[in-house]
UniProtKB/Swiss-Prot annotation:
PANTHER family noted in UniProt: RIBOSOMAL PROTEIN S7
Lineage of source species: Bacteria, Pseudomonadati, Gemmatimonadota, Gemmatimonadia, Gemmatimonadales
Protein name as it appears in the record: Small ribosomal subunit protein uS7
Alphabetical UniProt keywords: Ribonucleoprotein, Ribosomal protein, RNA-binding, rRNA-binding, tRNA-binding
Gene Ontology terms, MF aspect: rRNA binding; structural constituent of ribosome; tRNA binding
Family to which the UniProt record says this protein belongs: Belongs to the universal ribosomal protein uS7 family.
InterPro entries: Ribosomal_uS7, Ribosomal_uS7_bac/org-type, Ribosomal_uS7_CS, Ribosomal_uS7_dom, Ribosomal_uS7_dom_sf
Role description: One of the primary rRNA binding proteins, it binds directly to 16S rRNA where it nucleates assembly of the head domain of the 30S subunit. Is located at the subunit interface close to the decoding center, probably blocks exit of the E-site tRNA.
Gene (UniProt): rpsG
Subunit structure: Part of the 30S ribosomal subunit. Contacts proteins S9 and S11.
């Protein structure tokens, strides 16, 4: 760990269409090689598809999907006397959101739909209903923490 003073959290500007910092952060995570306008096009296109399929505001469905993906606990490796234990720890609020976004993006990219807009829209819809691969990842994370509950006293 650094001995210097801790890094200052930068404030992120909200996006133009929904005026939301969460959406802006998601677009930044979605962006590849600095192509922000492409990432915005993908996200807004996906939200249009979601709105067409659900007749609900797309950003509302997106936020519901993120809430369904946020993990409460995760495991961290801790080495004690030559043995490595998977110790369950509670996840900080900002990390919960970051993990949910990361999982949503990565499992969207793995889907079989034609365009990234369609892939993202399908994964958001699935996650908002509590299904899909991203939700499965969250449940696996929770299951792993539950299985290693015996090592919780090794927390640091």
């Amino acid at each position: 760990m650094s001995r210097r003073k801790s890094a200052v959290k930068r404030t992120i500007l909200p996006d133009a269409r929904y005026d939301s910092q969460t959406v802006s952060k998601f677009i930044n995570s979605l962006m590849i090689q600095g192509k922000k306008s492409t990432a915005e096009g993908i996200f807004y296109g996906a939200m249009d598809i979601v709105e067409a399929k659900t007749s609900q505001p797309g950003v509302g469905v997106f936020k519901q999907a993120l809430n369904n993906l946020k993990p409460v606990v995760e495991v961290k490796s801790r080495r004690v006397g030559g043995a490595t234990y998977q110790v369950p720890v509670e996840v900080r609020q900002d990390r919960r959101t970051a993990l949910a976004m990361r999982w949503l993006i990565s499992y969207s990219r793995d889907r079989n739909e034609k365009s990234m807009k369609e892939k993202l829209a399908a994964e958001v819809l699935a996650a908002s209903r509590g299904e899909g691969n991203a939700v499965k990842k969250k449940e696996d994370t929770h299951r792993m923490a539950e299985a290693n509950k015996a090592f919780a006293h090794y927390r640091w």
